A protein has these predicted regions:
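An N-terminal hydrophobic leader/cap segment in hydrolases
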Residues: 6-64, 75, 355
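The serine-hydrolase catalytic nucleophile loop
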Residues: 94-107, 120
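Conserved alpha/beta-hydrolase
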Residues: 108-129
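Catalytic nucleophile-loop/oxyanion-hole region of alpha/beta-hydrolase
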Residues: 124-157
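Alpha/beta-hydrolase fold nucleophile elbow
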Residues: 159-169
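Hydrolase active-site cap/lid region
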Residues: 181-245
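Serine-hydrolase catalytic core
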Residues: 229-314
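Catalytic active-site module of serine/aspartate enzymes centered on a nucleophile-bearing elbow/loop
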Residues: 305-345, 351-361
Length: 366
């Protein structure tokens, strides 16, 4: 009987002890102002050169409506090919303008695809929301602006009734995926340097804590969910201060399937580390592919991979966006093992994705 009582007391005391431990932990981290540091660092903007283009000859410069009575700026570029194969919405990286899409899209334009690039509010020539200061993180404002861009494409006289593709760089890719998760009009997705909130924030929080505390148990022994908890608290505080919301791409990316996704990322990216990108990629459902471009820093995969990059993106959209009667001879990857050995198999009669030998496949259960 005594052992039953001991077991019962232990069972009842365990939740109390856990609650007490969490309370003490919270007070310790609060005393160290860890949450304040999380909020402050979350708002720090990365330092890198943002590409900005100049107006493109022959482009259709447009302004279209968004919520809060704003007018957003964009450019519509028509293909030089005789037959249009599809329309692609281009999502810009943080701070750039719509004309910067050209280096990414020249090959697409020459091969049958129209491109529509646009600037979210408080960026480029788009109107600004009073009191809103954009960060590198996607908020509900960029999400709503991307939805407005999709609506604009649907309303054009030359709209493609079958839908559009998405090609997004960094923040523009994140906003595009968030919008596409709610809109089947987007049929396929290519992203470069894309990132989400928690899969980026939690690893950095583990790194930051070593700066503000030399306690081993804080640095190593705390479980990941503790960092997620503080991350959520930090985002809630920042949401109140900024009067915006930070949507979770980790949830939305699961809703993209069965539409195909190609994620491109640089192996030398020091802002969004490859393991962060892979953690996000694993949350997506098949069909999906991941290409880690060797030696590329953040948003520098095009500069490193060059023609290989252009051809990979083109063939992806040819395979998944263009009409299937395309006359080209596709190249098909037989399986990840053949990819590792550099073996490519040509197959006539059906569209298939041609990918570079360096494309990295994760196993089907990822």
């Amino acid at each position: 009987v005594i052992w039953i009582w001991i077991g019962l007391i232990f069972t009842l005391c365990l939740p109390l002890a856990a609650w007490l431990a969490l309370t003490l932990l919270f007070r310790y981290l609060k005393k160290k102002q860890f949450l304040d540091h999380v909020v402050r660092i979350f708002q720090e903007k990365p330092i890198f050169i943002v590409p900005r283009g100049v107006p493109i000859e022959g482009a259709e410069e447009v302004f279209f409506p968004a919520n809060h009575n704003l007018q957003l700026h964009g450019c519509y570029l028509r293909t030089s090919a005789r037959r249009r194969k599809g329309v692609i919405l281009f999502g810009l990286e943080f701070g750039s303008n719509c004309w910067s899409c050209l280096p990414y899209c020249e090959n697409l334009l020459a091969n049958g695809f129209d491109i529509f690039a646009f600037e979210t509010r408080n960026q480029g020539e788009s109107q600004s929301s009073d009191g809103y200061e954009p960060l590198q993180w996607v908020t509900n404002f960029e999400l709503e602006d991307t939805k407005s861009a999709l609506q604009y494409l649907k309303n054009r006289p030359d709209a493609d009734p079958s839908g559009v593709g998405l090609f997004g760089i960094s923040k523009g890719g994140s906003a595009g995926l968030l919008a596409a998760a709610q809109d089947p009009y987007v049929r396929c997705f290519v992203t470069d340097g894309v990132f989400a909130t928690y899969t980026t924030m939690v690893p950095y929080m583990r790194k930051w804590v070593t700066i503000y505390s030399d306690k081993y148990w804080i640095q190593v022994l705390l479980p990941t969910w503790i960092y997620r908890w503080f991350g959520k608290l930090g985002l809630k505080r920042l949401s109140r201060e900024k009067r915006c919301r930070f949507p979770h791409l980790e949830r939305a990316i699961r809703k993209l399937a069965p539409r195909p996704l190609l994620m491109i990322h640089g192996s030398a990216d020091t802002y969004i580390k490859p393991e962060m990108a892979e953690a996000l990629f694993k949350k997506a459902r098949h069909p999906k592919q991941f290409w880690l471009v060797e030696g590329a820093k953040h948003n520098q995969a095009l500069q490193i991979a060059g023609d290989e990059y252009q051809q990979c993106v083109l063939n992806f959209f040819k395979s998944h966006l263009a009409p299937q009667e395309d006359e080209r001879t596709p190249v098909r990857i037989r399986d990840p093992e053949s990819l590792a050995n550099g073996e490519l198999e040509k197959q006539k009669g059906s569209e298939s994705l041609m990918v570079p030998v360096s494309l990295k496949f994760l196993p089907p259960n990822s």
